[in-house]
């Protein structure tokens, strides 16, 4: 039998589909999410409803976002979930989560087994809506979770680490082996909880400036910041900010990146924006 077929559905590579089928793992994830009636629960990529069913059983209403037309149609006719579901058959990357939270009347609790081929850009999309999100629980490639939680001075630490930790508290929940899926992915997976900060620990004046600095620094991560960010900061300014110009991108903390971003926001008129 084709191991890409699960419950009569052929997993589609272009959608990054791997279907969760390990009941212990499913129960552990649902327990971590702890869905409650009355909450604005939103699932991204419900697939064959491995998480949708146990979460939906606890709720009166559940919103799901599913790109695959066939899977969305299956959910509409689901024997007991159908009436509870609000289904958006679209790419989550095009979803306005702010408008959705407004429509639902409260911050969203977002969860899902994210397609690994779009997980990083989707995370950045969601970060732009953290004002509208209470928390997020995602199954991701373990390597991505390692990057989300990484601190300075580690190989896994990068732009995703800085931006995720700027917006959220990042908490690893559990690791999941390939055998928990059909078809088994070639990588280990992990579940992570992201809780947007109620008060930003290191507020920045302009998020686009923080984004620019981290992009430029980590695109040249082997260079010292004297060189990688030399077009934005002089050695004197870095020293004044208490940042060693001989450090590399991976040595700089989230707080220091935010400090640099705020200095640059205040001094952008003298530099190109």
Swiss-Prot record:
Tell me which Gene3D superfamilies the record gives: Ribosomal RNA adenine dimethylase-like, domain 2, Vaccinia Virus protein VP39
Q: Which SMART domains match?
A: rADc
Q: Which GO terms describe its cellular component?
A: cytosol
Enumerate the subcellular locations listed in this protein's record, separating them with semicolons.
Cytoplasm
Gene Ontology MF term list: 16S rRNA (adenine(1518)-N(6)/adenine(1519)-N(6))-dimethyltransferase activity; RNA binding
The family annotation for this protein states: Belongs to the class I-like SAM-binding methyltransferase superfamily. rRNA adenine N(6)-methyltransferase family. RsmA subfamily.
What name is this protein filed under?
A: Ribosomal RNA small subunit methyltransferase A
